[in-house]
């Protein structure tokens, strides 16, 4: 594992470090009033032999949060760090970001007409304290043709998304039913996240000073 740091402008006003380059996670935290500074961490994303999908995604979130917490300890301001990871799971098979068009199309066709699980783990850590939550959401897709899957890939939207689709974008048209947390499918379960932030006394919109 290697780590490096990168900061958003306005770090002095941040209340939380975010160990993620995901614009969706930044947007979701901003949605609930959390000001973040980004730390860039590089954590190997390789599922270990015998590791369940739930164990895998939680380990990645924890490792990212801890890598960020170690970097945070070297920064001028000592703040908790949030790490998160999202995977799509169908029949115990983990679908992460597609490698290329062939992989992306194959993912969509595997999900076509089926119910899959989106697992998002979120961890908040300092070097002294670590807490984590896991959100599991059932998502059911309608039938998708190969031609439609190819057309969707060529929009560019699915390339950087677990499972090869974005529920908050064009990919919403594939979703017939969702049971669980919509924001977890986007990238960060806000209910669970707020619970963690409260434990670290990170302000959200309900307790921001006027």
Curated annotation (Swiss-Prot):
Q: What is its EC number?
A: 3.6.1.9
This protein's cofactor list reads: a divalent metal cation
Please list the GO biological process terms of this entry: nucleotide metabolic process
Q: What class of enzyme is it?
A: hydrolase
CDD domains in UniProt: Maf
Localization annotation: Cytoplasm
Q: Which GO terms describe its cellular component?
A: cytoplasm
Q: Which residues form the active site?
A: 85 (proton acceptor)
The record places the site described as Important for substrate specificity at: 24, 86, 168
Signal sequence: where?
none
Instruction: Quickly give the catalysed reaction.
Output: dTTP + H2O = dTMP + diphosphate + H(+); UTP + H2O = UMP + diphosphate + H(+)
Pfam families, alphabetized: Maf
Q: Name one GO molecular function term.
A: UTP diphosphatase activity
Q: Which UniProt keywords apply?
A: Cytoplasm, Hydrolase, Nucleotide metabolism
| Entry similarity comment | Belongs to the Maf family. YhdE subfamily.
Matches recorded under HAMAP family: Maf (MF_00528)
Q: What does this protein do?
A: Nucleoside triphosphate pyrophosphatase that hydrolyzes dTTP and UTP. May have a dual role in cell division arrest and in preventing the incorporation of modified nucleotides into cellular nucleic acids.
Q: What is this protein called?
A: dTTP/UTP pyrophosphatase
Q: Lineage of this protein's species? A: Bacteria, Pseudomonadati, Pseudomonadota, Gammaproteobacteria, Cellvibrionales
């Amino acid at each position: 594992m290697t780590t490096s740091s990168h900061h958003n402008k306005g770090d002095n006003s941040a209340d939380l470090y975010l160990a993620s380059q995901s614009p969706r996670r930044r947007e979701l935290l901003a949605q609930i009033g959390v000001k973040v500074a980004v730390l860039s961490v590089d954590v190997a994303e390789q599922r270990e032999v015998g590791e369940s999908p739930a164990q895998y995604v939680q380990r990645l979130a924890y490792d990212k949060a801890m890598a960020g917490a170690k970097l945070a300890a070297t920064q001028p301001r000592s703040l908790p760090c949030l790490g998160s990871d999202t995977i799509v799971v169908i029949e115990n098979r983990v679908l992460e970001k597609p490698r290329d068009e062939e992989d992306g199309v194959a993912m969509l066709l595997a999900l076509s007409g089926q119910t899959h699980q989106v697992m998002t783990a979120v961890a908040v850590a300092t070097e002294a304290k670590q807490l984590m939550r896991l959100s599991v959401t059932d998502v059911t897709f309608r039938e998708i043709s190969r031609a439609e899957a190819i057309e969707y890939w060529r929009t560019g939207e699915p390339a950087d998304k677990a499972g090869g689709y974005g529920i908050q974008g064009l990919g919403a048209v594939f979703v017939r039913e969702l049971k669980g947390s919509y924001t977890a499918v986007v990238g960060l379960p806000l209910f669970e996240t707020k619970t963690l932030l409260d434990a670290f006394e990170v302000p959200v919109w309900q307790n921001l000073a006027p």
